Design a protein with these regions (language model features):
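Hydrophobic ligand-binding cavity/cleft-lining segments
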Residues: 1-31
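Glycine-rich portal/gate segments that line the openings of hydrophobic small-molecule binding cavities
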Residues: 19-70, 74
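Glycine-centered loop/turn positions within well-structured domains
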Residues: 9, 60, 86
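Short, intrinsically disordered, mixed-charge
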Residues: 13-20, 58, 108-112, 116-119
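Beta-strand/loop substructures that line and gate deep hydrophobic ligand-binding cavities in soluble
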Residues: 63-120
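Generic structural detector for well-ordered beta-strands
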Residues: 1-5, 52, 78
Length: 120
């Protein structure tokens, strides 16, 4: 869980726009389809992340599946809060990871990067 000092709309905006204000330093560019239900992130390390949104209930729920190389997974975020504070609860299920990869740590790093952009 993470908490941000801003409205859910702002958190939603950044989570669905990986290149907005260069907030995610690992993403070099992204292609977003017209409906916003499919994103292909081109990462600075040369890999791509293919994201398909299953559910976008703005601004309260995001649900997607993703593929990055041999790694596949599902991500769900539920945003709770009001105009000046948002609590974000996430679940992350990952397949295809090596023994030493820690998905929870990666998720925490992602949420911390988002916190730096949005404020505490």
């Amino acid at each position: 869980q993470a908490t941000y000092g801003c409205a859910p709309n702002k958190v939603w905006l950044y989570m669905t726009n990986p290149t907005l204000n260069s907030w995610n330093p690992t993403v070099a560019s992204a292609e977003v389809d017209l409906e916003g239900m499919h994103i292909v992130e081109k990462n600075k390390d040369g890999t791509t992340t293919d994201i398909h949104f299953d559910k976008l209930d703005k601004p309260r729920r995001i649900s997607c599946t993703f593929t990055r190389g041999k790694i596949r997974g599902a991500f769900t975020a539920i945003l709770l809060g009001s105009a000046d504070s948002t609590s974000l609860e996430c679940t992350l299920d990952v397949e295809g990871l090596g023994l030493f990869t820690k998905p929870q740590k990666k998720l925490e790093e992602y949420l911390e990067t988002l916190r730096k952009v949005l404020g505490d």
